[in-house]
C-alpha cells in the first residue's frame, strides 16, 4: 500500500497507529496511538467505524483511483452480467454489493491461509467465504471479516443448511438430521474427520 500511495511503510504504520487510538476495542487492551495524531483521523473514523460496507467500497474506489482506473474497470469480470440498462443508484448499489462481497471473500480467505477451516482444502475455486451470522440477518456484520469463515463448498452448503454449526469453543456440531447418516460411507469420509 505504501508504494501505491507514494509513502514509506513507516508513515503508513504511523497513520494506522493514530486510528488505533480511536478504536474502543484496542483501547480496552491498552493500545494507544500517538498523542495528537488521532484528531487528524477522527472524521474518517466517525464516518466509517459503523459502516463497513461504505468503508470497503470507498477503499476500493480510492485504490482504483491510485491504480489509474475505476472500480468498474478493476472488477470488470465480476460485474460483466450487470445489464447496461441498469443505471443510476440501482447500478451503483449493485456494483457496491458485488465489489464488497469480493473484498470480503479475499479478506476471509487470506485470514484462513486460503484453506478450508475444516478440511484444509486449498483450491481457491472450491472455497467460500461463509458468513457466521447470515448476510441477510445482520447488516452491521455483513462485511466484518470476523463474521467470516473459509469453508469448502461442501461444508459451506452443510453450514448454510444448518446441517453443521459451531460451538462457542469452535467445535463442529452436527444436526440431528445429519447424524441420521452416521455409518454411511460418505459420512465416514467427509464428516467424521471434522
Language-model-detected regions and their locations in the chain:
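Major-groove recognition helix of helix-turn-helix-like DNA-binding domains
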Residues: 7-22
